[in-house]
Amino acid sequence: MSATLQASSTTKDSPISETEFATLIDNEKDKLTDTHEFIRSITNQLSVKSSKFKFLVEVTSVSSSESITTNVTITSSIGSLWDDERDGYYSFKVQTKDVYLVTVYWIYAD
């Protein structure tokens, strides 16, 4: 299953498009079982997209040894002071055997 967008900012100057990031996640999703390796691979690929931005990648995994028969609510909050026109984020859901929430944040740093 491919990565599906769950949320995003309304940034004008995104260093990577939503589609490019979804493709990047899809190409690397086999590494999600080792989140450190997945994050390292994603950040290395993002670093060549633009030297004017710093990137943060967050992975949240949702798994259970038993079948989940009810809806699960996961809440995550983050706060920042940033430039709404240059800084932003994409948050994707990736369904494999487990569910992963992958978020990339970019901050303009020129």
UniProtKB/Swiss-Prot annotation:
Q: Which protein is depicted?
A: Topoisomerase I damage affected protein 2
Q: Where do the coiled-coil regions begin and end?
A: none
* Protein family: Belongs to the TDA2 family.
Gene it is expressed from:
TDA2
Q: Does the keyword Cytoplasm apply?
A: yes
- TM segment ranges: none
InterPro entries tied to this protein:
Tctex-1-like, Tctex-1-like_sf
Which Gene3D superfamilies does the protein's record reference?
A: Tctex-1 (3.30.1140.40)
